[in-house]
Design a protein with these regions (language model features):
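Metal-dependent phosphohydrolase cores
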Residues: 1-112
Length: 112
């Protein structure tokens, strides 16, 4: 079930891994799916950590497994910037900022 889930859901990094010219490479994840992935990460941390959850939990989870994830370097950088912003400013302020940038048609890779 897990292989099916991550292979069909574009917010999983595994979806953005492809063989190009005979070599496996990470592909830059569209910002829409970066945001979905951040939400998925937050939800998973809240479910598994329950009362132990803090605004740092999604970042800590990401950092603990980032070497095992084959994210495109630009995607990895954006993930970490957003997760650090959550740690410092909280979810509400982070998603408010993301919504503002998206409504202004800004590229999160450039503007966040």
């Amino acid at each position: 079930g897990w292989l099916h889930h991550k292979g069909l859901n574009k917010h999983h990094w595994e979806y953005w891994w492809d063989k190009i010219n005979g070599k496996w490479q990470a592909i830059k994840m569209p910002q829409k799916y970066v945001v979905e992935s951040i939400c998925d990460r937050i939800a998973a941390c809240k479910v598994y950590q329950k009362d132990q959850y803090t605004p740092a939990s999604p970042l800590n989870y990401y950092l603990s497994s980032k070497d095992e994830q084959n994210l495109h370097p630009l995607t990895a950088n954006l993930f970490e910037r957003i997760l650090r912003y959550i740690q410092i400013n909280g979810e509400e302020n982070t998603f408010k900022r993301i919504k503002e940038l998206l409504h202004q048609k800004k590229d999160l890779y450039q503007s966040f």
